[in-house]
């Protein structure tokens, strides 16, 4: 029986490359000279922006987002937190990466597939939604219906099997 999986993943190698490019650009750009603006990564692959002012922190976030977009990483996978004051009159901002389907999002996807009226079944399996059907055309229609719903998270369709 044909099936496919709906997942929400981020290519961590592309994030790493974009992070390094953004860090180099911030170190070399004239408008960032002397502002003590820097990017750091933690173990959970989140990005911490430290800057001397809110404007420089926002500009650093824009540089990071630009580099991620050029590398093909969906910007919906970023979750920038609020700017918070740090020591020495600086500010910092944590940018979290959204990875994996949350249960609420998976339920919304299943509900969208069911309300579309296509003859397929959707089931939540861990951090993925498996959609099965009798015909390949039904599965392609389900993919189209999910894409048309415009969920606020980046979705990928994997393991399309006949």
Curated annotation (Swiss-Prot):
Q: Which GO terms describe its cellular component?
A: cytosol
Q: Which domain of life is it from?
A: Bacteria
Gene Ontology MF term list: nucleotide binding
Name any one Pfam family assigned in the record.
DUF520
The positions making up the signal sequence are none
UniProt entry keywords in alphabetical sequence: Nucleotide-binding
Describe the family membership recorded for this protein in Swiss-Prot or TrEMBL.
Belongs to the YajQ family.
Summary of the function given for this chain in its UniProt record: Nucleotide-binding protein.
* Protein name (database record): Nucleotide-binding protein AnaeK_0101
